[in-house]
Amino acid sequence: RDLVRSRGLGDVYKRQPQPFVGWVPFGNVTVQDADPCFDRNPHYVRVVNDGRLLRAGLDNEGYRGIGVKQGEEYRFSVYARTPDAKPMKLSIELVNSNAQNLLKKEIEVSGNNWQKLTAVLKSPFTDAHARLRILLETRGTVDMDHISLFPVNTWKGRENGLRADLAQALYDLNPGVFRFPGGCIIEGNSLETRYQWKNSVGPVENRPLNENRWNYTFKHKAFPDYFQTLGLGYFEYFLLSEDLGAEPLPVISCGLSCQYESNEVVPMLSLIHISEPT
């Protein structure tokens, strides 16, 4: 999985109004939605270095820390633009759990059209609780969206791929059938939050965020930042089934939300497409 938490930057589900989940902004950093990079994830961040503040940028804490290993490579990517079209310099840093900056790489943003920028970071240290830091070094403005830090070493070497050791363990089991993505996760707490497979294919950056089924199941056990980015979706599951040599068994919504949580039902006429050939 991606090591960055909330890589969509500002795209949050409506029950969680906090736009910087997983992030610590510093300096002049705001959430914007004018002329977005992705129509289904329309929010992005604008970072402004006005020349007076020492720093302007963001830190990402990952999932209780970003786990990195010495000598391993990690692919950083970001979609960025400069509203005034002037070349801007971003520094990408890996910071260890002692707040020491042990790796720094610079990339240049130029042009007022969205573009994907990438860099491979080779970690010089091992730490279970590292952080990713992005700084705007040049005076000016940069818009950023979908910031990602992904291990280069994945199953079959695929970008946005699976953890190699876990996928290998599945392969070694020699399964005949692979069922995905699960059971209750399909239902959702409501029809609005049910798992809709069409949202889990296509460009990863434009797969809409969805609430997780167990986000608010119990009032005394609420996890307001527990969401599905759908970075692992039907496309990746079918690829894995093919790699495993297993028969894929996809689970789809039958038009019922979790009947323990709600009594919502999709009208029968809306389900005709499930049974009729196209």
List PLM regions with ranges.
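Single conserved hydrophobic/aromatic residue that forms the stacking wall/gate
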Residues: 2-13, 272-278
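Extra-cytoplasmic beta-strand recognition segments
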Residues: 7, 11, 45, 54-90, ...
